[in-house]
Amino acid sequence: MTDSESPIPKKSIPARFPKWLRQKLPLGRVFAQTDNTIKNKGLPTVCEEASCPNRTHCWSRHTATYLALGDACTRRCGFCDIDFTRNPLPPDPEEGAKIAESAKALGLKHIVITMVSRDDLEDGGASALVHIIETLHTELPTATIEVLASDFEGNIAALHHLLDAHIAIYNHNVETVERLTPFVRHKATYRRSLMMLENAAKYLPNLMTKSGIMVGLGEQESEVKQTLKDLADHGVKIVTIGQYLRPSRRHIPVKSYVSPETFDYYRSVGESLGLFIYAGPFVRSSFNADSVFEAMRQRETSTSALLPNKD
Protein backbone atom coordinates (compact mmCIF):
# COMPACT_ATOMS: atom_id res chain seq x y z
CA MET A 1 0.00 0.00 0.00
CA THR A 2 1.41 3.41 -0.95
CA ASP A 3 1.41 6.50 1.26
CA SER A 4 -1.50 7.86 -0.77
CA GLU A 5 -3.48 4.75 0.13
CA SER A 6 -2.75 4.98 3.84
CA PRO A 7 -5.86 4.35 5.98
CA ILE A 8 -4.74 7.07 8.40
CA PRO A 9 -6.48 10.40 7.70
CA LYS A 10 -4.53 13.41 6.44
CA LYS A 11 -6.48 15.83 8.62
CA SER A 12 -7.13 15.68 12.33
CA ILE A 13 -10.56 15.92 13.90
CA PRO A 14 -11.40 19.25 15.61
CA ALA A 15 -8.79 20.24 18.19
CA ARG A 16 -11.30 20.85 20.99
CA PHE A 17 -11.24 17.90 23.35
CA PRO A 18 -14.44 16.25 24.57
CA LYS A 19 -15.16 16.74 28.26
CA TRP A 20 -13.64 13.42 29.29
CA LEU A 21 -10.26 14.51 27.92
CA ARG A 22 -10.09 17.72 29.92
CA GLN A 23 -8.20 17.49 33.16
CA LYS A 24 -6.87 19.77 35.85
CA LEU A 25 -3.11 20.02 36.13
CA PRO A 26 -2.09 19.08 39.69
CA LEU A 27 1.00 21.26 39.84
CA GLY A 28 2.46 21.82 43.27
CA ARG A 29 5.34 21.20 45.65
CA VAL A 30 5.68 17.48 44.92
CA PHE A 31 5.67 18.11 41.16
CA ALA A 32 8.46 20.67 41.58
CA GLN A 33 10.48 18.29 43.76
CA THR A 34 10.21 15.52 41.17
CA ASP A 35 11.11 17.90 38.36
CA ASN A 36 14.20 19.13 40.23
CA THR A 37 15.31 15.63 41.21
CA ILE A 38 15.20 14.38 37.63
CA LYS A 39 16.76 17.45 36.04
CA ASN A 40 19.56 17.60 38.61
CA LYS A 41 20.66 14.15 37.44
CA GLY A 42 20.44 15.12 33.77
CA LEU A 43 18.13 12.18 33.08
CA PRO A 44 15.71 12.01 30.16
CA THR A 45 12.24 10.69 30.93
CA VAL A 46 9.64 9.44 28.51
CA CYS A 47 7.29 11.77 30.37
CA GLU A 48 9.05 14.78 28.83
CA GLU A 49 10.64 13.40 25.66
CA ALA A 50 7.37 11.84 24.44
CA SER A 51 5.23 14.78 25.62
CA CYS A 52 3.08 12.52 27.79
CA PRO A 53 -0.20 14.16 28.90
CA ASN A 54 0.12 12.49 32.30
CA ARG A 55 3.43 14.07 33.31
CA THR A 56 1.93 16.47 35.85
CA HIS A 57 -0.21 13.72 37.38
CA CYS A 58 2.67 11.28 37.75
CA TRP A 59 5.27 13.78 38.89
CA SER A 60 2.83 15.12 41.46
CA ARG A 61 2.85 11.69 43.09
CA HIS A 62 6.64 11.24 42.93
CA THR A 63 6.68 8.81 40.01
CA ALA A 64 8.41 8.99 36.64
CA THR A 65 9.41 6.69 33.80
CA TYR A 66 13.09 6.80 32.92
CA LEU A 67 14.14 6.82 29.26
CA ALA A 68 17.29 4.72 28.86
CA LEU A 69 20.03 4.71 26.21
CA GLY A 70 19.69 8.34 25.26
CA ASP A 71 17.02 10.85 24.34
CA ALA A 72 16.99 10.22 20.58
CA CYS A 73 15.67 7.16 18.74
CA THR A 74 16.86 5.37 15.59
CA ARG A 75 13.25 4.98 14.49
CA ARG A 76 10.76 7.63 13.50
CA CYS A 77 7.30 6.37 14.49
CA GLY A 78 4.43 8.59 13.38
CA PHE A 79 2.82 8.79 16.83
CA CYS A 80 5.90 9.43 18.94
CA ASP A 81 7.45 12.76 19.93
CA ILE A 82 10.90 11.44 20.84
CA ASP A 83 13.65 12.91 18.64
CA PHE A 84 14.99 10.85 15.73
CA THR A 85 18.67 10.34 14.94
CA ARG A 86 20.74 8.16 12.63
CA ASN A 87 23.84 8.59 14.79
CA PRO A 88 22.99 8.36 18.50
CA LEU A 89 25.58 8.81 21.21
CA PRO A 90 27.10 5.69 22.80
CA PRO A 91 25.29 4.43 25.90
CA ASP A 92 26.28 6.26 29.09
CA PRO A 93 28.08 3.79 31.41
CA GLU A 94 26.97 5.89 34.40
CA GLU A 95 23.29 5.87 33.45
CA GLY A 96 22.40 3.12 35.91
CA ALA A 97 24.01 5.00 38.80
CA LYS A 98 22.20 8.21 37.85
CA ILE A 99 18.84 6.47 37.68
CA ALA A 100 19.50 4.75 41.00
CA GLU A 101 20.30 8.07 42.70
CA SER A 102 17.16 9.63 41.27
CA ALA A 103 14.98 6.65 42.25
CA LYS A 104 16.34 6.79 45.79
CA ALA A 105 15.63 10.51 46.04
CA LEU A 106 12.05 9.94 44.86
CA GLY A 107 11.58 6.96 47.16
CA LEU A 108 10.52 4.68 44.31
CA LYS A 109 9.59 1.11 45.14
CA HIS A 110 8.62 0.22 41.56
CA ILE A 111 10.97 1.58 38.90
CA VAL A 112 9.83 1.82 35.29
CA ILE A 113 12.41 2.04 32.53
CA THR A 114 11.66 2.45 28.87
CA MET A 115 14.17 2.83 26.07
CA VAL A 116 14.71 4.35 22.68
CA SER A 117 15.21 1.86 19.86
CA ARG A 118 18.95 1.43 19.28
CA ASP A 119 19.19 -0.29 15.92
CA ASP A 120 22.78 0.97 15.70
CA LEU A 121 23.87 -1.46 18.43
CA GLU A 122 24.43 -5.14 17.73
CA ASP A 123 22.08 -6.31 20.46
CA GLY A 124 19.70 -3.36 20.21
CA GLY A 125 20.98 -1.99 23.50
CA ALA A 126 20.05 -5.03 25.60
CA SER A 127 23.47 -5.24 27.29
CA ALA A 128 23.41 -1.57 28.26
CA LEU A 129 19.89 -2.01 29.61
CA VAL A 130 20.95 -5.04 31.65
CA HIS A 131 23.83 -3.02 33.13
CA ILE A 132 21.32 -0.41 34.30
CA ILE A 133 19.07 -3.08 35.82
CA GLU A 134 21.98 -4.75 37.63
CA THR A 135 22.99 -1.39 39.10
CA LEU A 136 19.43 -0.81 40.30
CA HIS A 137 19.31 -4.26 41.91
CA THR A 138 22.52 -3.43 43.77
CA GLU A 139 21.53 0.06 44.87
CA LEU A 140 17.81 -0.58 45.51
CA PRO A 141 17.60 -4.30 46.28
CA THR A 142 13.95 -4.24 47.38
CA ALA A 143 12.65 -2.26 44.39
CA THR A 144 10.81 -4.01 41.58
CA ILE A 145 11.73 -3.14 38.00
CA GLU A 146 9.47 -2.89 34.98
CA VAL A 147 11.01 -2.58 31.52
CA LEU A 148 9.29 -1.33 28.37
CA ALA A 149 11.67 -2.64 25.72
CA SER A 150 12.04 -2.27 21.98
CA ASP A 151 11.68 -5.30 19.71
CA PHE A 152 15.50 -5.62 19.41
CA GLU A 153 14.79 -6.25 15.70
CA GLY A 154 13.64 -9.73 16.65
CA ASN A 155 16.92 -10.67 18.38
CA ILE A 156 15.89 -13.47 20.74
CA ALA A 157 19.32 -13.73 22.36
CA ALA A 158 19.09 -10.05 23.29
CA LEU A 159 15.60 -10.60 24.71
CA HIS A 160 16.75 -13.53 26.85
CA HIS A 161 19.71 -11.50 28.10
CA LEU A 162 17.26 -8.86 29.31
CA LEU A 163 14.90 -11.38 30.88
CA ASP A 164 17.77 -13.02 32.77
CA ALA A 165 18.29 -9.71 34.61
CA HIS A 166 15.38 -10.47 36.99
CA ILE A 167 12.76 -7.90 36.10
CA ALA A 168 9.23 -7.90 37.50
CA ILE A 169 7.43 -6.93 34.29
CA TYR A 170 8.47 -7.24 30.65
CA ASN A 171 6.52 -4.77 28.54
CA HIS A 172 6.56 -4.47 24.78
CA ASN A 173 3.81 -2.54 23.04
CA VAL A 174 2.14 -3.56 19.81
CA GLU A 175 0.82 0.05 19.82
CA THR A 176 -2.02 -0.45 17.30
CA VAL A 177 -3.98 -3.03 15.34
CA GLU A 178 -2.23 -5.10 12.69
CA ARG A 179 -3.69 -3.24 9.68
CA LEU A 180 -2.42 0.14 10.86
CA THR A 181 1.00 -1.00 12.08
CA PRO A 182 2.94 -0.19 8.86
CA PHE A 183 1.73 3.41 9.02
CA VAL A 184 2.13 3.92 12.77
CA ARG A 185 5.36 2.09 13.65
CA HIS A 186 8.63 2.63 11.79
CA LYS A 187 10.69 -0.51 11.09
CA ALA A 188 8.45 -2.66 13.29
CA THR A 189 5.94 -5.38 12.52
CA TYR A 190 2.89 -6.56 14.42
CA ARG A 191 3.82 -10.23 14.10
CA ARG A 192 7.39 -9.69 15.26
CA SER A 193 6.12 -7.93 18.37
CA LEU A 194 3.76 -10.82 19.11
CA MET A 195 6.67 -13.22 18.61
CA MET A 196 8.81 -11.36 21.15
CA LEU A 197 5.98 -11.32 23.69
CA GLU A 198 5.24 -15.01 23.21
CA ASN A 199 8.91 -15.92 23.50
CA ALA A 200 9.19 -13.99 26.77
CA ALA A 201 6.12 -15.74 28.17
CA LYS A 202 7.50 -19.16 27.26
CA TYR A 203 11.04 -18.41 28.44
CA LEU A 204 9.84 -17.28 31.89
CA PRO A 205 6.28 -18.56 32.43
CA ASN A 206 5.91 -16.78 35.79
CA LEU A 207 7.00 -13.40 34.42
CA MET A 208 4.39 -10.65 34.15
CA THR A 209 4.16 -9.83 30.44
CA LYS A 210 2.55 -6.59 29.35
CA SER A 211 1.61 -4.79 26.15
CA GLY A 212 -0.36 -1.73 25.15
CA ILE A 213 -2.37 -0.23 22.33
CA MET A 214 -3.59 3.22 21.38
CA VAL A 215 -7.08 3.80 20.03
CA GLY A 216 -8.39 6.69 17.98
CA LEU A 217 -6.13 6.01 14.98
CA GLY A 218 -8.87 4.71 12.71
CA GLU A 219 -9.05 1.15 13.99
CA GLN A 220 -12.30 -0.81 13.92
CA GLU A 221 -13.90 -2.35 17.00
CA SER A 222 -13.43 -5.81 15.53
CA GLU A 223 -9.71 -5.10 15.05
CA VAL A 224 -9.26 -4.08 18.69
CA LYS A 225 -11.00 -7.27 19.79
CA GLN A 226 -8.75 -9.31 17.50
CA THR A 227 -5.67 -7.56 18.88
CA LEU A 228 -6.72 -8.42 22.44
CA LYS A 229 -7.23 -12.04 21.38
CA ASP A 230 -3.82 -12.09 19.68
CA LEU A 231 -2.15 -10.76 22.82
CA ALA A 232 -3.91 -13.31 25.02
CA ASP A 233 -2.99 -16.11 22.62
CA HIS A 234 0.67 -15.06 22.74
CA GLY A 235 1.01 -15.19 26.51
CA VAL A 236 0.45 -11.57 27.47
CA LYS A 237 -1.06 -11.03 30.92
CA ILE A 238 -1.52 -7.24 31.20
CA VAL A 239 -2.80 -4.88 28.49
CA THR A 240 -3.13 -1.10 28.63
CA ILE A 241 -5.50 0.73 26.28
CA GLY A 242 -5.45 4.52 25.93
CA GLN A 243 -6.51 7.35 23.66
CA TYR A 244 -3.98 8.44 21.04
CA LEU A 245 -3.32 12.17 21.31
CA ARG A 246 -1.37 13.92 18.58
CA PRO A 247 1.85 15.46 20.00
CA SER A 248 2.12 18.02 17.18
CA ARG A 249 0.95 18.79 13.66
CA ARG A 250 3.91 16.76 12.37
CA HIS A 251 2.44 13.58 13.79
CA ILE A 252 -0.34 11.23 12.73
CA PRO A 253 -3.73 12.93 13.07
CA VAL A 254 -6.32 11.69 15.53
CA LYS A 255 -9.17 9.90 13.78
CA SER A 256 -11.58 9.76 16.72
CA TYR A 257 -11.94 10.44 20.43
CA VAL A 258 -12.97 7.17 22.03
CA SER A 259 -15.64 7.41 24.73
CA PRO A 260 -15.17 6.13 28.29
CA GLU A 261 -17.99 3.66 27.62
CA THR A 262 -16.00 2.16 24.74
CA PHE A 263 -12.96 1.77 26.98
CA ASP A 264 -15.19 -0.04 29.48
CA TYR A 265 -16.37 -2.32 26.70
CA TYR A 266 -12.82 -3.12 25.60
CA ARG A 267 -11.97 -3.86 29.22
CA SER A 268 -14.79 -6.39 29.45
CA VAL A 269 -13.69 -8.00 26.18
CA GLY A 270 -10.12 -8.34 27.41
CA GLU A 271 -11.14 -9.65 30.79
CA SER A 272 -13.28 -12.31 29.11
CA LEU A 273 -10.05 -13.49 27.45
CA GLY A 274 -8.29 -13.73 30.81
CA LEU A 275 -6.32 -10.51 30.39
CA PHE A 276 -5.72 -7.92 33.09
CA ILE A 277 -6.94 -4.73 31.42
CA TYR A 278 -6.19 -1.14 32.37
CA ALA A 279 -8.14 1.06 29.97
CA GLY A 280 -9.17 4.69 29.84
CA PRO A 281 -8.62 7.91 27.89
CA PHE A 282 -5.40 8.87 29.71
CA VAL A 283 -3.99 5.38 30.21
CA ARG A 284 -0.46 4.85 28.92
CA SER A 285 1.92 1.91 29.32
CA SER A 286 3.59 3.30 32.41
CA PHE A 287 0.67 5.32 33.81
CA ASN A 288 0.07 4.23 37.42
CA ALA A 289 2.41 1.33 36.68
CA ASP A 290 3.14 0.78 40.36
CA SER A 291 -0.56 0.45 41.17
CA VAL A 292 -1.19 -1.83 38.20
CA PHE A 293 1.73 -4.03 39.27
CA GLU A 294 0.34 -4.33 42.80
CA ALA A 295 -3.16 -5.06 41.52
CA MET A 296 -1.81 -7.74 39.20
CA ARG A 297 0.25 -9.25 41.99
CA GLN A 298 -2.86 -9.37 44.18
CA ARG A 299 -4.81 -10.99 41.36
CA GLU A 300 -2.26 -13.75 41.16
CA THR A 301 -2.91 -14.57 44.82
CA SER A 302 -6.64 -13.81 45.02
CA THR A 303 -9.75 -13.80 42.89
CA SER A 304 -10.06 -10.04 42.59
CA ALA A 305 -8.05 -6.82 42.70
CA LEU A 306 -8.84 -3.14 42.46
CA LEU A 307 -7.37 -1.04 39.68
CA PRO A 308 -6.42 2.60 40.25
CA ASN A 309 -8.74 5.27 38.89
CA LYS A 310 -8.54 5.00 35.10
CA ASP A 311 -9.03 8.70 34.54
UniProtKB/Swiss-Prot annotation:
Keywords per UniProt: 4Fe-4S, Cytoplasm, Iron, Iron-sulfur, Metal-binding, S-adenosyl-L-methionine, Transferase
MF terms (GO), sorted A to Z: 4 iron, 4 sulfur cluster binding; lipoate synthase activity; metal ion binding
Origin: domain of life: Bacteria
Record bears the keyword Iron-sulfur: yes
Species in which this protein is naturally found: Chlamydia trachomatis serovar D (strain ATCC VR-885 / DSM 19411 / UW-3/Cx)
UniProt KW Transferase keyword: yes
Coiled coil: none
InterPro entries attached to this UniProt entry: Aldolase_TIM (IPR013785), Elp3/MiaA/NifB-like_rSAM (IPR006638), LIAS_N (IPR031691), Lipoyl_synth (IPR003698), rSAM (IPR007197)
Enzyme category, top tier: transferase
UniProt-listed NCBIfam families: lipA, PRK05481.1, PRK12928.1
Cross-referenced CDD domains: Radical_SAM (cd01335)
Name this protein carries in UniProt: Lipoyl synthase
Major localization listed first in the record, in broad terms: cytoplasm
Binding site for [4Fe-4S] cluster 2: C73, C77, C80
UniProt xrefs under PANTHER family: LIPOYL SYNTHASE (PTHR10949), LIPOYL SYNTHASE, MITOCHONDRIAL (PTHR10949:SF0)
Cofactor note: Binds 2 [4Fe-4S] clusters per subunit. One cluster is coordinated with 3 cysteines and an exchangeable S-adenosyl-L-methionine.
UniProt record similarity statement: Belongs to the radical SAM superfamily. Lipoyl synthase family.
Cofactors demanded by this protein: [4Fe-4S] cluster
Pathway: Protein modification; protein lipoylation via endogenous pathway; protein N(6)-(lipoyl)lysine from octanoyl-[acyl-carrier-protein]: step 2/2
